[in-house]
Amino acid sequence: MNTIVGTYECKVDAKGRVLMPSPLKKQLASSLQEGFVLKRSVFQPCLELYPMQEWNGMMQKINKLNRFVKKNNDFIRRFTAGVKVVEIDALGRVLVPKDLVGFASISKDVVFSSAVNIVEIWDKDLYEKSINGEDIDFADLAEDVMGNVNDDDNGIS
């Protein structure tokens, strides 16, 4: 698993093309040949860009679900709804299909935000609202999520 780092602001053109920021492109260089999967986020009004290797790992996990359990089948259908294989073109751009532009309410300004091993693509205004929102106290969230983690190998502080 490659860890991706950084948050970058970009412009999207009228055709839905976004120039991938150079530092991000360098981090994803090993994935450029294999391509990427672009999908709707489950929890947020943004898109998720998976390097193909990460997507294949996710699909291996999902493939273990019993499809004769209705809940599993419904999840698979919704999780993969609108999924697109995308590539970085010769000019370093990603084409965001119109249905996904609509889902994420992308206008002119977008944010590429690293999320461990994938990249979230947000409309800039929605991104700002999400990280600055008063609906979540980040200190409380950090304590709830990471407060009881006891990682003896790597020493999470």
Identify what each model region corresponds to.
Residues 1-9, 14-17, 24-91, 99-157:
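Flexible "stalk/tail and boundary" regions
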